[in-house]
Every structure is written in structure tokens, then in C-alpha cells.
């Protein structure tokens, strides 16, 4: 088998951290050529060479240019930011229920002395307004959900005529850190490393070692 045609390194994915856990040689793709003749060995080498050329071109097309092939933390500029339009929800109105909720609250505190019932036959009831202000009852002081403010600085900003609620789906800050499985497949195409053992040991990529730790940037038992 020609040593000039290397076997690709396959990257593994760590879904908990959103990082590539490292790369190792995919020996399952190697063909059994021990009992083959020169003609068969030549055909096998042609297939392996064609495969490597496809992987090299695929990496140039899909991989994002970056100074570190497998960074421990991906910046927001290298991650796809999914922007979704806001969601509008229709709020159903129940005017009868709203009236009951705002009109049926009895006033629990008034500050006056108790008097016989025949003197005060009128029962005081809350009308869904702010109790520390002398405001006339109007539609703008009522909330459709039946809640009214018992004390505070001003009227509610909730407009009872609004029938829709807008929800913002996207985050206010861009996403950074790890990558998803879909981006991992695009960014980490099987790596073709030409003559991996031809240079000094210090030039061999640490990320192609099985016990390499990306978080500490070290190889267990060596550093």
C-alpha cells in the first residue's frame, strides 16, 4: 500500500460542549489488499487517492477560515445566528368576565368608624381603579385580565383594546461558545494529513492524538 496516500482522520463530536473531541484514523475505510496482486493494489490506491481529493475539496468549500482548526470556544462571528420574526398571538376578549372581575371586588379598608346598617345602606365596591387616586372610571383604567393596581404611581400601561401579544423569539445577544451538530458536519470534514509521521514528533498535531484534551490544550501523560 502506498504510504503517500494517507487514511483520513475522522473527527468526533462532543454534543455536551459543542466542540470537536478530537480526530482519529478511520481504519474501517481501509481495504483488504494483503492477498491482492499489483493490478488490484493499483486500483485500490486510485480509489483512496480519489477519495482524499474529494475530502480536500469538500473542506475548502464548507470549512470556515479560522486561525485554529478546533477552537475551544467559537466566537459569535463564526457561528450562524438564527434570526426569527416575532410571534404574534391573538388574545381573546371576554367582556362579561372582565366586568365581573373588576366590579366584584369589595373595598376592604376605608378608615371610617363602624355605623349601623340603616345609616349606610350603600356598599362600597372597588371599580378596578387605582385606590390612591381620585380618577373617574374609564376603559383605560381597566385591564382585560381583571387585575387592577391597588397602589402605586400611575395608571397601567396595558391597553385593554389591544387584542394581540408580540413575542420576541431571538436572543438580544449573539450566540457564542459551542457549535451544533449541523455546523460540525460542515466544519469538520475528514482531514487528509499528508505524511503525518514524516516530521519531528513536535510537529504532529496534538488534536490527532486520542487522549488530547481540548479544554486544557494538553495531552494526558505527555504534558
Swiss-Prot record:
Listed under GO cellular component are: host cell nucleus; viral capsid
Q: According to the UniProt entry, which residues carry Phosphoserine?
A: 170
On induction, the UniProt comment says: Expressed in the late phase of the viral replicative cycle.
InterPro entries in UniProt: Adeno_PVIII
Q: Where is this site: Cleavage?
A: 111-112, 153-154
- Report residue numbers covered by any propeptide: 112-153
Q: Where does the record place the modification Phosphothreonine?
A: 64
Modification after translation: Cleaved by the viral protease during virion maturation. May cause the middle segment to be shed from the capsid.
Give a single Pfam family match.
Answer: Adeno_PVIII
Q: Which domain of life is it from?
A: Viruses
Q: Which GO terms describe its molecular function?
A: hexon binding
What keywords is this UniProt entry annotated with?
Capsid protein, Host nucleus, Late protein, Phosphoprotein, Virion
Q: What's the family?
A: Belongs to the adenoviridae hexon-linking protein family.
Q: What else is known?
A: All late proteins expressed from the major late promoter are produced by alternative splicing and alternative polyadenylation of the same gene giving rise to non-overlapping ORFs. A leader sequence is present in the N-terminus of all these mRNAs and is recognized by the viral shutoff protein to provide expression although conventional translation via ribosome scanning from the cap has been shut off in the host cell.
Subunit and interaction comment: Interacts with the peripentonal hexons as well as the hexons in the facets. Part of a complex composed of the core-capsid bridging protein, the endosome lysis protein VI and the hexon-linking protein VIII; these interactions bridge the virus core to the capsid.
**Annotated protein name in UniProt:** Pre-hexon-linking protein VIII
Q: Which organism is it from?
A: Porcine adenovirus A serotype 3 (PAdV-3)
